[in-house]
Amino acid sequence: MHIPRKTTAIIGSGGKSTLLRALAEELATGGAANAEFIAAETATDKPRVGTSPNKDCPTEKSAGDKPSVDGGELSTRRPAAKENAIVEEPRRAHVIVATSTKMFVPDWCPVLLDPTMDEVRLALSTHPIVCVGRIHRPTGKLDAPRMAFSELEAAADYLLVEADGAKMLPLKAHAEHEPMIPECAKRTVCVVGIDGVGSPISQACHRAERFAQLADASTADAVTPEMVARVLEAESLHDMVLINKVESDNDRRVAERIAALCTTPVVAGSLWRKEFRCLR
């Protein structure tokens, strides 16, 4: 998953906040996400790394110094340096995380509440990641920052914005006012929780009636891979899909079926296990 510099919006359901943290930490340390989330494939997965035709899913050959697959796990090892050679460490990037709607207050990075831009820049001089926003007093959640996202974007290498809500459910459809994608966003990643497939729409989906309408189904119907793809394609709010919680052979088959019906790049895997591969 190529993450361009400046603003990326994260929408959907089933792992947005987890992806926000994973990307922020990788980007800040100059790790895998600094250019790509590389697919971690098992020894039996096909196609192997090095054969992906998708420019957003770089091959092992094209990834250069990026992580490669070693024994089925994500590897960030570099070739052994020559004796006495100076190894240049990757530059630490500055990352701002925020929301355009509301999200739980992060406990894994400094949180700046209603700061000035000078305070944001000062915090970034000592911390690679900062979160910017305001407290929404009725809920205690973090609300959108007062300043424009274009101002925040100018202060950091990366701005990651959680631009959606899903009531902690694995799937969702969007109301007319959703998602709240910043105008400056260069990429929009839609997260899908595969654990919603097989459950009734009424139980697995935020805005179940809207999901059922787009899927040409009833809210009592069980979610199918075809329904998930149909809703994604009907809404067309993203330029990349991340299918999360793919942790079994059956999960992989379901994810592959969804990907086959999508027209945008699709990455599938597990944020918890830190294992992903590009499906299209």
What are the language-model segments listed below?
Residues 177-196:
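Inter-motif core of Ras-like GTPase G domains
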Residues 2-27:
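Walker A (P-loop) phosphate-binding motif
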Residues 261-277:
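Canonical P-loop GTPase G-domain recognition
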Residues 26-32, 40, 88-131:
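N-terminal phosphate/diphosphate-binding loop that engages ATP/GTP or pyrophosphate donors
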